[in-house]
Each structure stands twice: as C-alpha cells, then as structure tokens.
Amino acid sequence: MGLGRYEFLADYGDGFIAYLNGQEIIRVNLGAKDTPVAHDRSTDRSHESHIYRQYEAPVDGFYIDSAIVRSLIHPGENVFAIEVHNDSVANDLSFACTVYNLKNNGWYNIYNSVFRYYRQVPLDSSKFPIVVIETDEMGIPQIHTRVRARMKVIDKPGLKRPTDLPVYEGYISIERKGESSAWFPKMSYNLETQNADGSNQNVSLMGMPAENDWVLFCSFADKSLIKNELVFMLGRKMGHYEPRTQFCELIYNGEYMGLYYFAEKIKRDKNRVNVGKRDTVFPENGGYVFKYDKPTRKLVQFIYPDKDEVTTAEKNYLTGYIKSFEATLKSSKFLDPIEGYRRYINPYSPIDYIIINELTKNCNAYLYSTYFHKDSRGVINYGPLWDYDLAFGGASWQEGTLTYKWQFEFNTDLNIKLMLRDTVLKNRLAERWWKLRSNFLSNDSLMHYIDSLYQATTDSRILNYKVWPVEDKYLFGPDHYVASADEEVAFIKDWLRKRLAWIDANIDKIYYSARC
C-alpha cells in the first residue's frame, strides 16, 4: 500500500503525545509542540474519554498529511508511539486509538467518524478578533445540552494574538447549535454571557450593542465561508435589521478551530428586533418574535416571549391571529380593503423577503429558519434573515441548485403564491426589484461585494482549510463538486449571474388567478 494521508482517531483522558519514529506529530493538552514533558507531568486541562462519558458521539480525529508521513517513514520497521498523561494522580487513565489510511477516500463524510478529522494548526495572529473558550473535562456534549464555560475575547487594534490581554473575560453558557449541523465536525454554538452567579450579563462585544445572547457560526457547508454575511449585508442595505456579525477566530480548549463569525442571536431588544414588551393580561398589546422551522413546520415557534415562558393566552392569541390571516388568504375576501389579508401583515414587508430568497434561491426559504415579528397591536412583518449557507446553488434538494423557477412555488408553506394574486403586491414586487437592480443588486455591485468579502477573509480562510482539510472534498448539500474555495466563489458568481438574468426575464410575468 502506498503512503497517503492518515487519520488518527483517539479517545483519551486526559492528554497525549503521538510520535512517528521518534518525531512528534500530535500533541494534546501537554503544552507547546516539541517542548520536553516529564513522565509525571499532569495535563494542561482535563478531558474525559468518551468511554467514561457514556454517550454516543464521534471521538477526535487528527489529520496527518502525506508530506509528514513521507518525511518520517522509512523502509523496514517503523515505530508509532503514544505517550499518555492524566490530569492528576488517579486511576482513571484511559486511551484508545485507531489509524486509518485516507489515500483513496475523497469524500469527507460528516456523519462517519472514520472520515471526519482536523489538523492541529497553531494560530499565531489574525486581523479578526480571537475567541477563546474553555470548558470542563466533558466539553460540550449532545445537542441542546447547555454547559458552563469560560470565554475570552481578544480584540485589540491591529493584529490580534492569542497571548494578548482580552477585552472581555467571563463565564458563558454554551450549547451546540442546529439540528443536523450540530453533528458536523466543525460545530456552531449558541452562547450566553453570564455573571459568576449564572445570571445574564449584557456586554458589548466586537463593536456590537450590549446583550447576552450570541451565536458562533461556522458555515461548514459553505466552502466560500461568506454566504451568510453577504445576505445579511444585502438585508441591511434594504433598510432592515439583520443580525450584526464579525468574522473571528476560535480557540476551543486549546485547539485552533478555524474561521467563524460572531453574531447577534435573533431576539427582542431595542438594538435587535425592536418590538414592544409582552403583556400577559392583554396579549394583543404585546410584541412577538416567532418563526417557522423544522420539525414544527406550520406550528409557531416562539422566540419572544420565550417558548418556556409563553402563556396560554399569548399562544392562543398569536396562533389565532396567524390562522385568521391564512384563512383570509384562502377566502373570497382576501382583497377586501377592510377584512382582507392586508389587515394582518405589513403589505410591504414580504417584498424584500421574497427578493432576497429568490435572488439566492435559498432551498430552505419559506420553510425553515423563517423569522417574523409583530409589534404591540401591530401586524406581522417578515424577518430578520437567517441561515443562507446552502443558498446560491448550494443544495441538491428542494430545487436549490436551479437558476430558474420561483422558490415560493416549491416551498408553499408561507402562501407567497396566494399573496401574489394581489396585483398591487405583485406590481410593488416588480417595481422594487428593478429599483434595487439599478442600485446595489446590479451585477457589478453583487460581484464586487462577493469579491470584497472573499478577499477580506483570505488569510484566515487559508488557515481554516489547513485545520479542516476539506476544501477539495464533497461536503454537505451540493450536486456540484469544486476542488477549492476559489472554484466555489467562481461557481457562486456564475450561478448568480444566471439567476439574476432569469428573474429579470420573469419578474414582470408573475400572474396567479384569484382562484388559484
């Protein structure tokens, strides 16, 4: 068998060093690479093995590239040695490992522990803020399980280094974010900044207004790493609140995890979704933030009031309001100036939402991660925008890869097609489209935004793909294959030009009979 790339799977407690023919190739929780380690040294931090955790989860897979293997392997006998250390003098030392040859496996399988791995790469410096998170020995376990941790944010002017003094250091509560994506090797996280007693601590981070709920988003399925930021920027240019974001680097329990972006979590706040406070006595007087999302589909998920705190009266009021809106859309009175559908929604609000989701042909549009808000005694508004890493031709399902057809005709849950029977709304949609096309949605402007975002992340993106050697691998979603992030951006731009041309040719042709 020829020499190839290898993966070293390790289930350990609490740290180890791996050597190939006497040369160190992997080190975990035992100080800096190639520094001497006494035989009785304890580890830098605790790490409980998965065997002792007693739950099913992939163990850590470390990538060993072919250049290292070729430089260290020689003809004849070779020695692969492991030095294992505990966090203290105790009888719970544990270690198990396996080595796989990856030479003939091009597909990086996010759901198969054999083919999901990362490379240990040190972070020397970055122009982006550095987020450092330290958990206890259990790490961040299964989905929807919050744990206490510590977080530092390094964000001085100029280049930032992991050794710099932090501008913020404190406690957080953190959990894996997402459903299927929560099992990706590179994970996104929801986190809450806290005081020592566990109460919320509102802090201003990376230039964003003070709050306590945040998201660390990695966009693992998006090889360009810029789709979400591009869409949020377009939403802001349209004049709407979209979550503020900042690219950042993540160091998790001593390991550099690559490029992320730090984002505001969608919630009610004067600097986020600015709706009125709840009214538990007269629920129609309260503000609401809610969404449609899997697995509930047509059921409302409450964001504000919190789903665990919402009263029966509030739930009945909002669900009743939405059901009345949907029933009116399907009735003969849907265009009635007094009793029609416009009494329930801001008639301008769907327009920009439709434009963004048709421009990107987001496969999840009108179906998943779809947010709404309603102010006190007000009507429903669409937004904020969220979750576009599979947009721009990035998904092979729900017609997400097509540059033609309307996405609202495929994903029908939000009844966009029914609303567009209203010729006033349809004409406003076309007028808005052409106005934006002559401005920041022009071909030249969009290509410029893509190039600017992509170039701004160059150094961090290159380092990210050293950590996660998947740039040339087929990942999650697309029916196209690209061998690099550069090729992915070229694909996005070509796909977008075709999509824009199709919308230009069809936006004025939208017509649905009042009886459809």
Predicted regions and their residues:
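Surface-exposed patches in mature extracellular/periplasmic domains of secreted proteins
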Residues: 3-7, 240-250, 336-340, 441-445
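An acidic-aromatic loop/edge-strand motif
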Residues: 31, 41-119
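Conserved oxyanion/phosphate-binding beta-strand-loop segments in alpha/beta enzyme cores
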Residues: 159-220, 317
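Internal "kinase-insert"/substrate-recognition segments embedded within catalytic cores
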Residues: 192-198, 209-219, 238-243, 255-355, ...
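A conserved alpha-helical element in kinase catalytic cores
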Residues: 220-240
